Amino acid sequence: MRGTLTLLNKWDARWLEIAGVVSTWSKDPSTQIGAIAVKDKRLVSTGYNGFPRGIQDYDDRWNNREEKYKYVVHAEMNCIYNANYHNQSLKDSTMYIVGLPVCHECAKGIIQAGVIRVVAEFKDAPLKWARSTEITEKMFKEAGIIYDQI
């Protein structure tokens, strides 16, 4: 359910602020998304929408939407992959995401990684993603994941 920042505690607000900073690391000229994973008030992993490790992020790849989508790893999945790369478990963690709601593909990864709560801050999502975000909400509910949308 969509809420307001006033409903969150001070730690949620702080972590969302950090996820917002992480989103600025993305080189995507049109969409910047940031995700962080937190466990026991400790930052475990970060991710932003970008290309996989070692893949050149040429301007022509970023500026052509059709081409870009073939390369980009979503922030949530990058957060999961980065945790794995650094031998960090996301089991029982909270993921904070700034920019867009969680798509159904990222929801699957979040569930499989053992995240127990997701806090997503975003403005209105594009209508074309309505079905994807609807499926995300259903999967999170069924998996027992708390999903706070702001």
Show the residue positions of the predicted features:
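Zinc-dependent deaminase catalytic domain
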Residues: M1-I150
